[in-house]
């Protein structure tokens, strides 16, 4: 089944929830280093997705890789709650909170909010290399959308629309007909 709240889906408290089909489990156990990234028991990607030189509330700093493009941001429909969960507009965030940050390589003004390090999540010994945030590989929403695609390919438009609209309803997006 779908989790009732998408807002906490990618936070630590949303790990292994009712919607989770498969998550890569991570811990904050120390052991990683740039000479041995494979030694990490934590999610290295979180540190790489973080805001470069961030100083402010909620988020810790990172390396500013894997940033969303304007095209990605524009692909969300008005009212789609997944946009705020998925994308952080760093300029709006800085204006709202007084946070400061540096410009990373290929700066777009946006960050992958799902996987920005949160204050208190990082293991100090492995700064940015050992984050306990699980990677949500397959969620039930993904299964519904895969089933919708398979149904569409076999000519079952009704099932395809039903499954797409289940996911869209949770995101508070308009139904497809």
Predicted regions and their residues:
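Structured, solvent-exposed acidic/aromatic patches
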Residues: 1-39, 122-138, 153-163, 173, ...
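An aromatic- and glycine-enriched ligand-binding surface/loop that stacks and positions planar moieties
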Residues: 1-101
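Short, hydrophobic/aromatic alpha-helical segments in well-folded domains
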Residues: 71, 146-147, 163
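Flexible, polar/acidic helix-loop-strand segments at domain edges
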Residues: 71-140
């Amino acid at each position: 089944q779908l989790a009732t709240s998408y807002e906490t889906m990618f936070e630590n408290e949303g790990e292994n929830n009712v919607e989770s089909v498969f998550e890569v489990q991570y811990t904050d156990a120390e052991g990683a280093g740039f000479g041995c990234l494979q030694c990490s028991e934590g999610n290295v990607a979180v540190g790489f997705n973080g805001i470069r030189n961030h100083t402010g509330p909620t988020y810790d700093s990172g390396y500013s890789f894997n940033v969303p493009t304007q095209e990605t941001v524009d692909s969300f429909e008005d009212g789609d709650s997944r946009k705020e969960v998925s994308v952080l507009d760093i300029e709006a965030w800085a204006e709202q909170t007084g946070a400061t940050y540096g410009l990373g390589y290929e700066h777009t003004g946006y960050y992958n909010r799902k996987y920005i390090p949160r204050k208190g999540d990082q293991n100090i010994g492995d700064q940015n290399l050992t984050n306990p945030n699980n990677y949500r590989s397959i969620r039930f929403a993904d299964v519904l959308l895969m089933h919708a695609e398979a149904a569409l390919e076999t000519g079952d438009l009704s099932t395809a629309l039903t499954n797409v609209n289940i996911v869209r309803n949770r995101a508070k997006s308009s139904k497809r007909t």
